[in-house]
Amino acid sequence: TLPVIFETEAMTSLFSAFTGLWNGELLYKGISCLKDKWNEKILSEKITIEDDPRNVEALTIANFDDEGCPTRKKVLVKDGVFVQALHSTKSASCMQTESTGNGFKSGYASTIGVSPMNCCIVPGEKSLQQLEETMKDGLVITDLQGLHAGIDFVTTNFSLQASGYLVKDGKRDRSVTLITVAGNFMDLMKKVEEVGSDLDWSYH
């Protein structure tokens, strides 16, 4: 198997499909696979995940959620360890904790649920070019399709159509299209060796 780099837009698409793993309501109901993983190492130590509705660099910011609770920056995963979930007042009450300011409506007429806002993997220090040079030979995935049909949230399995390009001797070689990328999101994130530096909020 080839080493793989997920370019920012592709990883954002895949990551966004699984942000519900840290949803307090889904944890309480036992739907999230992290329900018994508190304070355990669940991902690579290279990965820290934050949720920050007040991030001024993001496209959307909120000082309060739709329940009137103040928002704040939360660290959900620290160096690969699951440390915190997202909560509305309802999910917080069920789990005997406090709201994290993540009680939002998905639409005007919808009910309030737990939702992330500006949730991201904290960027590393290497650029995409540096990652390609380090990898030497491998595949860079730039786009993923079929996220609605190819994702199993409960098992975190995925099978998606992808496109990108091959890297040979640390340099871009040729484009590839209509390939299938399949695996398990949690297993994938456990094997991450580096996180790129090019976080782009326009994709969120």
Describe the role of every protein-language-model region.
Residues 1-204:
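N-terminal small-residue-enriched
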